[in-house]
Amino acid sequence: MYRDIKFSLWCDFLERDFINGEFLNLIENSVINGATSNPSIFKSAICSSCAYALLKDEYKRKRPKELYEILATTDIKMAANKLLKNYANDDDGFVSLEVDPNLYDDSEGTYKEGKRLFNIIKMPNVMIKVPATDSGYEAMSDLMKKGINVNATLVFSISQVKECLEAFSEGSRAYAKRFPGTPLPKGVISIFVSRFDRLLDKSLKNAGLETSKFGIYNATKAYKIIEQQDNKNIRALFASTGVKGDELPADYYIKELL
């Protein structure tokens, strides 16, 4: 989808029954060619879906984080397998798993957890999602030094984009030096779009100014900076493209960004 303009859609939702059903249909029909997840998505899926009921009973003696990791890494591996053909054909095919958000200010903890989760799943098309914080940048670089793909998340500002690019570049250079001729790890920078407008629109509307535009402007500027690097291993990923309420069409941000 949108391949003629070098855009692709990644599904921002995972749940076990969905992975075994509609998710595969979307891949096979070339609607999506990637996926992302986060702890909130998994919490909703695990708490509301019957697909996890027996597993939760089986692992009920596990601590909450242990139980979460068992269920989440299993789902991520299933999704990665479904996307493996895309990955093999150099058509994206990545799925992301986020580190514990409580580690946002702990670079070493983020790196160790990201490496551990990647090694549990053991799939080449998995990305470890790391928040774009001062500690996160260091962890991103360290993960890439080990050949681990990274999804930099919670990116709102141009300064964050530049920090992510530097972290990716540093990690990739170190990996290339250690393993010359080996394919480099991939990275995406997840630029959050609509949340700017949710914050600003009320004030802009009260001032008689046009609304729901700043997020698009900011994301477009960030995208251009990333594309100027001319690095096929690093791409922009537009996140938070959904709308709230019924004032805007559901696909408003997607169409504007295209």
PLM features per residue range, with description:
Residues 1-22:
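N- or domain-start disorder-to-order transition segments that initiate the globular core
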Residues 2, 27-30, 81-90, 115-122, ...:
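Acidic (Asp/Glu)-rich catalytic clusters
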Residues 12, 124-133, 148-160:
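Catalytic beta/alpha-barrel core
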Residues 13, 45, 59-71, 95, ...:
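Domain-level signal for soluble alpha/beta catalytic cores
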Residues 18-54:
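An N-terminal structural lobe/cap that precedes and organizes the functional/catalytic core
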Residues 20-27, 138-140, 161-166, 246-248:
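Catalytic cores of alpha/beta
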Residues 41-43, 48-139:
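Active-site beta->alpha loop and helix N-cap motifs at the rims of alpha/beta catalytic domains
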Residues 149-258:
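Catalytic alpha/beta core domains of metabolic enzymes, predominantly
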